């Protein structure tokens, strides 16, 4: 019995030791597992932050982290939106100047092109109007300077009218990176843009100056020789303008809405500038005639000017409809956004502009007798000028100020400033030389022009 109890006690002791050893082994294993788990957690934290967050912040803590991240993103998005809104508000004074400058540039540039056409086509009927065209053409200088200065200030981020000028817009990884605009940096780069802008300025002003210079020299010299010189200048200029009329429209206007493009835009802008310049030519000519000057201008000249204004109002409308209809019918997202913004935010000026640029002037001078009545033609010219200012307004303002637009002292002041400069330059040029281009080889034809 004692031996049995001893054996039983020995077995119990052995069992207890085995249990302790087993427990220690399990404890060591658990400790090793915990250490391995911790080490794995540290590695996972270095490799994938989201996985570590799930391990280290389970349940409510993880939800709090997600909510915090979403709140941070919302704040960042709000800050970016607020900054964009602030830029649009700050752009308004610059945009008001820019719209007026572009509009008055068109009044001179359209007549510079028309003046060149008179020499290339050897036109005789318009010889008595050339001095007015020359004066109007030279009025491009002041608005052109303002356009270039405002554009170049965008490179220094003085304003934010041109989205493609934003810092880092073409740098991969930059917060402002835009892959679509980055693809266009070959054309829309500060250096290339500046080179093109200077070429426009030099080429256009050179043509205006040379046509004026040779015209004045003909008053005291050989009129035929000077006329032939001007034919050469005009031929070179019309080819130059055929290219730059489109590229300048892309640079100065279409690049404001950098993502959007239209292959008709150059023609569309040219048509608007051209018809506006005829409206200005009509008003200046009738003003001078009303003051007792230019007695050689008769109702036939007025009729022809009215026909040009009528014809290019229809041409402008054709281009407007072609551009709008093709974009609307295709319904491509990157194209329709241009018109969606104007429908949503600029609906009133958008549709009023169509009425002023097409319906009213066409109805006013549709008949032959109406084109010969000064009062009717003046009214139609007024519609055209107001309408095409609104056209430029609708082209430029949505991309620069968004829905922070209006017509107040800024816009009115810009119009009055450039109108004053335009009138001053034109009347000063007219006062410096005889209104009649007396040695022009076709001046007699112009004096007795009939149709």
PLM features per residue range, with description:
Residues 1-89, 159-186, 212-230, 293-300, ...:
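Extramembrane terminal tails and long inter-domain/linker segments of multi-pass membrane proteins
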Residues 104, 108, 136, 140-143, ...:
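Hydrophobic alpha-helical transmembrane segments of polytopic
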Residues 108-113, 145-146, 197-209, 271-286, ...:
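Hydrophobic cores of alpha-helical transmembrane segments in multi-pass inner/ER membrane proteins
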Residues 115-135, 150-165, 209-230, 252-261, ...:
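Juxtamembrane membrane-water interface segments of multi-pass membrane proteins
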Residues 243-247, 382-393:
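Aromatic-anchored segments of alpha-helical transmembrane domains
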Residues 263-269, 334-354, 402-426:
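Membrane-interface transmembrane-helix boundary segments in multi-pass integral membrane proteins
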């Amino acid at each position: 019995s004692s031996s049995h109890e001893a054996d039983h006690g020995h077995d119990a002791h052995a069992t207890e030791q085995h249990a302790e050893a087993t427990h220690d082994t399990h404890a060591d294993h658990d400790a090793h597992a915990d250490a391995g788990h911790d080490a794995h957690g540290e590695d996972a934290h270095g490799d994938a932050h989201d996985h570590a967050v799930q391990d280290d912040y389970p349940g409510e803590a993880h939800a709090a982290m997600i909510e915090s991240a979403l709140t941070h993103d919302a704040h960042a998005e709000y800050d970016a939106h607020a900054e964009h809104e602030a830029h649009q508000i700050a752009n308004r004074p610059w945009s008001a100047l820019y719209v007026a400058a572009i509009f008055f540039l068109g009044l001179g540039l359209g007549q510079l092109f028309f003046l060149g056409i008179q020499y290339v086509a050897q036109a005789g009927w318009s010889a008595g109007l050339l001095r007015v065209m020359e004066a109007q053409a030279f009025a491009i200088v002041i608005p052109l300077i303002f356009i270039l200065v405002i554009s170049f200030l965008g490179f220094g981020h003085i304003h934010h009218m041109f989205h493609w000028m934003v810092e880092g817009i073409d740098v991969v990884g930059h917060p402002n990176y835009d892959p679509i605009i980055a693809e266009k940096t070959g054309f829309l780069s500060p250096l290339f843009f500046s080179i093109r802008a200077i070429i426009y300025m030099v080429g256009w002003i050179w043509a205006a100056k040379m046509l004026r210079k040779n015209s004045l020299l003909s008053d005291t010299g050989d009129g035929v020789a000077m006329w032939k010189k001007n034919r050469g200048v005009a031929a070179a200029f019309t080819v130059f303008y055929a290219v730059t009329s489109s590229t300048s429209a892309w640079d100065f206007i279409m690049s404001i809405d950098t993502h959007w493009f239209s292959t008709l835009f150059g023609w569309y802008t040219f048509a608007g500038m051209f018809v506006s310049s005829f409206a200005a030519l009509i008003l200046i000519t009738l003003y001078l005639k009303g003051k007792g000057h230019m007695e050689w201008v008769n109702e036939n000249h007025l009729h022809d000017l009215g026909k040009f204004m009528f014809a290019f109002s229809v041409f402008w409308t054709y281009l407007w409809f072609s551009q709008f209809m093709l974009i609307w019918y295709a319904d491509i997202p990157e194209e329709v956004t241009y018109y969606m913004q104007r429908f949503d935010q600029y609906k009133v000026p958008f549709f009023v502009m169509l009425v002023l640029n097409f319906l009213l002037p066409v109805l006013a001078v549709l008949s032959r007798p109406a084109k010969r009545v000064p009062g009717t033609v003046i009214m139609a010219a007024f519609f055209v000028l107001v309408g095409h200012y609104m056209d430029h307004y609708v082209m430029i303002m949505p991309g620069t100020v968004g829905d922070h637009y209006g017509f107040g002292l800024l816009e009115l002041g810009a119009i009055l400033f450039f109108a004053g400069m335009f009138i001053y330059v034109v009347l000063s040029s007219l006062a410096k030389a005889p209104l009649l281009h007396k040695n022009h080889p076709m001046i007699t034809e112009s004096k007795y022009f009939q149709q």
